[in-house]
């Protein structure tokens, strides 16, 4: 049994867009080790996206490939969490798209990987055998992503006054976006019904425990969830996704028939 195509695209789009964001640190890391670590994180995520796009393309048929799904869909076609597409800087600051705040990046990676260790763990039991195999491989990678981002969040939160302030500001901005994790979507409901997906809302307590334990160690305060629920996985995105796709897709769209 195959998972619904839109469900596969949702998982793939999350990995691709966050992988693309983390790749923006290549050559700009605060220290060489972190430059390499974030580049490797990006490669892991894009590798996960490739496997999922290949699986989805096989179901779609025709001329669909992993490349057409990554490079020739437009903003409304993407089903990623809004959290994954946000820039690396506070949204209200007067900065350019290319500016980077390390605390923002680590906070986002922590919040996302805290979810995905739970998601991939459960998807190992999916009735879609190919998705289950992808989950088993991805789980090993995202466990490292969680450990890496958690260590940095604790280091920043329990560090200097400046690093604590930056970590708290990042958390205050990003954590409300995680409300989208638990909002229902048609493709998730369909995948759950046919046994290929999981009940994402059932993971909320375990995710909260992972987050709260880390914040306690980091001496950070958890902000209120807020009432706004982002709608990225329904195809309604922030303005930031357009900038990500414009850069990521430019070469493929300029030379659509090129063979590399």
Located regions from the model:
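Acidic/His metal-coordination segments adjacent to aromatic residues that form catalytic metal sites
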Residues: 1-6, 72-108, 156-164, 174-197
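Alpha-helical scaffold segments that form or flank carboxylate-/histidine-based iron centers
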Residues: 4-8, 29-48, 105, 130-142
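Amphipathic, well-ordered alpha-helical segments in soluble domains
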Residues: 14-22, 48, 52, 112-119, ...
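Helix-loop segments that flank and shape redox-cofactor active sites
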Residues: 18-40, 116-131
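Domain-scale activation on soluble regions of proteins
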Residues: 21, 55, 82, 121-123, ...
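Conserved alpha-helical segments that form or flank metal/cofactor-binding pockets of metalloenzymes
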Residues: 42-78, 149-154
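Internal, conserved structured core segments that host functional sites
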Residues: 83-148
């Amino acid at each position: 049994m195959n998972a619904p195509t839109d469900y596969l695209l949702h998982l793939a789009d999350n990995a691709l867009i966050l992988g693309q964001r983390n790749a923006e640190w290549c050559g700009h890391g605060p220290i060489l080790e972190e430059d390499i670590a974030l580049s490797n994180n990006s490669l892991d995520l894009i590798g996960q996206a490739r496997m999922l796009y290949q699986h989805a393309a096989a179901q779609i048929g025709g001329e669909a490939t992993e490349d057409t799904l990554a490079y020739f869909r437009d903003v409304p076609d993407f089903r990623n969490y809004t959290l994954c597409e946000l820039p690396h800087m506070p949204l209200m600051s007067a900065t350019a798209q290319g500016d980077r705040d390390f605390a923002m990046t680590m906070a986002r990676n922590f919040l996302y990987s805290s979810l995905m260790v739970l998601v991939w763990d459960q998807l190992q039991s999916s009735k879609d055998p190919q998705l289950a195999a992808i989950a088993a491989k991805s789980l090993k990678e995202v466990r490292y992503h969680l450990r890496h981002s958690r260590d940095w969040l604790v280091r920043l939160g329990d560090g200097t006054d400046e690093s604590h302030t930056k970590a708290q500001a990042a958390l205050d901005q990003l954590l409300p976006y995680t409300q989208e994790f638990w909002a229902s979507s048609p493709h998730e409901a369909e995948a759950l019904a046919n046994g290929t997906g999981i009940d994402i809302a059932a993971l909320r307590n375990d995710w909260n425990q992972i987050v709260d334990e880390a914040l306690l160690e980091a001496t950070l305060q958890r902000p209120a969830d807020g009432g706004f629920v982002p709608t990225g996985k329904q195809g309604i995105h922030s303005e930031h996704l357009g900038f990500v796709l414009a850069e990521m897709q430019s070469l493929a769209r300029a030379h659509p028939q090129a063979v590399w």
